[in-house]
């Protein structure tokens, strides 16, 4: 999966895989006015991906794009909510088994 670029309100969002090996990371980089405003990173190991999406197995080559799509979907609404509230702090969402921890 390559980087995707979209706009929301006055922000430009660049999203895509950060690390393609465990722990997998998916990164949203948000710019406002041409400057980086914040990053939102999702980090997960294979077991956590399977716990959240039982039909997706990162070890299967055919499922890798599905994994990136699932991580993108998980972060999309959270990034928009951060923009809506004006929260420009960088955060990392860690998937640990079926639980989530945002730091």
Where are these regions (language model features)?
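Short, charged/polar N-terminal "headpieces" of proteins
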Residues: 1-37
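Amphipathic alpha-helical packing elements
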Residues: 22-66
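Acidic, low-complexity intrinsically disordered segments
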Residues: 48-103
């Amino acid at each position: 999966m390559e980087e995707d670029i979209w706009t929301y309100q006055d922000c430009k969002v660049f999203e895509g895989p950060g690390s393609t090996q465990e722990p997998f990371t998916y990164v949203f980089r948000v710019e406002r006015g041409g400057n980086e405003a914040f990053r939102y990173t999702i980090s997960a190991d294979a077991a956590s991906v399977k716990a959240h999406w039982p039909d997706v197995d990162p070890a299967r080559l055919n499922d890798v794009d599905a994994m990136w799509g699932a991580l993108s979907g998980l972060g999309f609404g959270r990034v928009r909510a951060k923009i809506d509230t004006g929260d420009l702090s960088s955060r990392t969402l860690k998937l640990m088994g079926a639980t989530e921890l945002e730091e």
